[in-house]
Amino acid sequence: MFPRILVTISAFLLVQMSLAQPMVGYFLSPQSELSKGRAFKSIEETSEIFLKGLTITPTRMEKKFNEFGNITSSVTYNSAGGKTNEIYCEYVNGENLVRKQTRSFVNHRGWQEEEVFITWDDCYSIPQKIEVKKNGQIWQSAKFITDSILKFESAEVFNSKGDHVFTERFTYMEASNIIKVMVFRANGAFNGSSTYPINHKESFTFESVKQTLNPNGDVMIETLSHAVSGDQAYYYEYEYDSQGNWIEKNTFQVNLSRGNRVTKKKLENKTTRKITYH
């Protein structure tokens, strides 16, 4: 059984980043990975999970980036070398996402496809409309309302028939580099909320997760904001390349004592990366 706090952190992050997101999330979710040196050209990532009593085969992911550090493709493979997920992104001026295609293999259903199309204003400074298709059929679309300085105020979301189904309202927390998105049904009933970075190329963290960084600026300890001494946490150890980017990351379940002292380390995940640069 997973410790309660670890399950809570994992569930929280999955909710924040999952595809069941507000429409604005298709634009605000990070499409890049930050390099501490030169811009990434490609990353080949292998991940192994270690759980007592379970044998889980490693997975491999290959990512490619443009010269601005934005992902152009991401392909995930199972242990047999078969593709299980594909993501392809297209940009204007290298930075403005205009199309994102995701193909995922789902058991008993086969390949499922999602396409996102983003329409920008004439200066490519802010999106005006987002349309999402699932398996070739229009699923939802959204039109955005901005203020005088081009900050999102709200979005009106429509279903495949053109009916208004949701309204998304935005609150900015500049000091934390965060936008909080509150979603309401067409009748005004609250439906949920999500959090995104204002600038995904700068550091940010979710409100409910507390992080301690190592001297290289990577997360070393991660726990819930209200955690106390003795609670469970995640602890990370890294190896780095000459650019300052990690090439091996080990994730441990740990107990925290006073002063963030780590005890009872249990290896949960090991990820290695082969990186090339522009």
Where are these regions (language model features)?
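Bacterial Sec-dependent N-terminal signal peptides
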Residues: 1-25
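Buried hydrophobic residues that stabilize the cores of well-folded domains
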Residues: 21-278
